[in-house]
UniProtKB/Swiss-Prot annotation:
The lineage of its organism: Bacteria, Pseudomonadati, Pseudomonadota, Gammaproteobacteria, Enterobacterales. Two distinct, membrane-bound, FAD-containing enzymes are responsible for the catalysis of fumarate and succinate interconversion; fumarate reductase is used in anaerobic growth, and succinate dehydrogenase is used in aerobic growth. Anchors the catalytic components of the fumarate reductase complex to the cell inner membrane, binds quinones. GO terms for molecular function: succinate dehydrogenase activity. This is Fumarate reductase subunit D. It is a multi-pass membrane protein. It holds the Pfam family Fumarate_red_D. Keywords: Cell inner membrane, Cell membrane, Membrane, Transmembrane, Transmembrane helix. The gene is frdD. GO terms for biological process: fumarate metabolic process.
Length: 119
């Protein structure tokens, strides 16, 4: 007999955030680290293209705030998802581990949203 009320899994939502964070961390984040962490301090980037005033104006725009949110939140979800599953693989069982790790990711995401909105 087929179960008429199968248990729904919430795992696809977390895997989606994990995948998005992994892609962001693999493609976008290294480019930003290269630009801001290496090229700018060495003076290899043209003039005042990324001066304080321009960066502040970008961060206060809608697209800049969205970029900051994605730059912080997606790798955060990816990292906490990896830690959650790594602990499971190592047979270290945290009581209510899903609530601990994904709850922490959700709380830190809300803190990030508050911080970026008040920027």
């Amino acid at each position: 007999m087929i179960n008429q009320a199968p248990k729904r899994s919430d795992e696809p939502v977390f895997w989606g955030l994990f995948g998005a964070g992994g892609m962001w961390g693999a493609i976008i984040a290294p480019a930003i680290v290269l630009l801001v962490g290496i090229l700018l301090p060495l003076g290899l980037f043209p003039g005042d293209a990324l001066g304080y005033d321009r960066i502040l104006a970008f961060c206060q725009s809608l697209i800049g705030r969205l970029f900051l949110l994605l730059m912080i939140i997606l790798p955060l979800w990816c990292g906490l998802h990896r830690i959650h599953h790594a602990m499971h693989d190592l047979k270290i069982h945290v009581p209510a581990g899903k609530w601990v790790f994904y709850g922490l990711a959700a709380i830190l995401s809300v803190v990030t949203v508050i911080g970026v909105v008040t920027l």
